[in-house]
Amino acid sequence: LVTNNHIRGNPYEQGCPTRRILDRIGDKWTVLIVGALEEDTLRFSELRRRIEGISQKMLTQTLRGLEEDGLVTRTVTAEVPVRVEYRLTDAGQSLRIPLKALEDWSIDHLGQVLDAQAAHQSKDAPSS
C-alpha cells in the first residue's frame, strides 16, 4: 500500500516485503553483527574475532544481505593490502535500539528459558 510517497506494508499479509526484512533482522547473526558494529567501523577479520562461532561463509552472507538492505556500508580502501571495512548506516544505527532490547531480554530471561527447556525435555523423555 502506497500512501504519501511512502510504502506501508502489512507483515501479516502473504507476500508482503516486510516479511523478508523481518527474516533478515530476526536472524541471530544479524543481531550480533549489528551489535558489534554499534560504535565501531570494523574489518571482516575483526568482526569474525568479535563474534565467536560465526563461520567465514555465514559472516560474508550476512554482511552482503545487510549491505543489500541498506543497513551496513562496505568501504574498500586502495591500500596494499586492500582494506575492507564495515559500518552501520543511519538505518542500521536505528535498528540497534530494538535489537539491543532483544539481546537484553535474552540475557535477562536465560535462566527461565533454560529451565523451561529442561522441563520440556524431561517431560518428553521416555520413562524407564
In which residue ranges do the predicted regions lie?
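Amphipathic alpha-helical dimerization/coiled-coil segments
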Residues: L1-N5, E13, Q93-S128
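N-terminal helix-turn-helix DNA-binding core of bacterial DNA-binding proteins
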Residues: Y12-M58, A78-E79, E85-R87, Q93
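Basic amphipathic alpha-helical segments that dock to polyanions
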Residues: L59, L63-L66
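Conserved beta-strand edge residues that scaffold enzyme active sites
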Residues: E79-V80, A116
